């Protein structure tokens, strides 16, 4: 049977806060004795918006804005009860979205 695995996806606009959160998660998992893979940087999603500067005329004058969404992936192999408890109490900075999935079955 496949060993249990926890997959954590981190998303955020600030890559420094994202890397800091990923390193906190990796340190916590290693302290509890589970194996960790990552953080793996996933492709950054760039959303661009073009807006007219003037409300009435001067269509040639436009402004460009963009939002960059950075992504990281952390896999935890063979998590223990202690690992899950320590991840639940972990304090992470605001602005980081966390998605946690369990992959695989119980051994």
UniProtKB/Swiss-Prot annotation:
Name listed for the protein in its UniProt record: Small ribosomal subunit protein uS10
Subunit structure: Part of the 30S ribosomal subunit.
This protein's record includes keyword Ribonucleoprotein: yes
SUPFAM superfamilies: Ribosomal protein S10
GO biological process, one term: translation
Reported function: Involved in the binding of tRNA to the ribosomes.
A GO molecular-function descriptor: structural constituent of ribosome
UniProt xrefs under Gene3D superfamilies: Ribosomal protein S10 domain
